[in-house]
Amino acid sequence: MSMKKVSIIVLFILSLILTISICGCFENEKEEVNKPNMTVIEKENIKVQNNKPIENLKEESCKLNITNDENRTNNITKTTKKYDFSKPVDMDKMFLNLPYNEETDFDDKIIKKYKNITFVVSRKPIDLSYAYIYNEVKEYPERDIFGNYIYYEFIPKNANLSISYCYYRKVGNYYIIMQTYEKSRKANDLWMNWTKYVFSLFEE
């Protein structure tokens, strides 16, 4: 067998393994967590057997410099902002100023709903392992000017439920997540605006 054919076979096997690892899911279900009116974020607060937290995002240092490129009148202007994540910030202040219709406070996290969008700020990594039980989960590592984050697509095994999407990132010692049922530029812009606002709270 030629080296070219061997290389093609190896690449195919590696691609297959990667696909299975990303989209893997389990078969067990519990009716309590499968209520149509519960979001993925709300289900996170229900204990599921053998829960394992998702891998932590890469740790950020207490102080961070971020360079933003701004295009103004066809000229590229670079601005560097410094962030100090050791600053004490009230979790309740980390939400955008929106007319939220629901708010839930826990010891280590706050959940707020605006229309059909859910926002969460947490002091601990948010456990999404249960989502792999009830959904086909597609995970997309992303990066923007503020660093790394993860974009999730949750496709319910129950065909009567809607597909949802989550943006998840670590900001200093906090974790923020935004869940929406809309895959659009509007949702992306809202996530970016919220990220920008949260980072602004830690500016030096």
Swiss-Prot record:
Subcellular location per UniProt equals: Membrane
Q: Which UniProt keywords apply?
A: Membrane, Transmembrane, Transmembrane helix
- Tell me what topology the record assigns in the membrane: Single-pass membrane protein
**Positions of transmembrane segments:** 6-26
Q: Give the UniProt entry's GO cellular component terms.
A: membrane
Protein's name according to its UniProt entry? Uncharacterized protein MJ0275
- Report which superkingdom the organism of origin falls in: Archaea
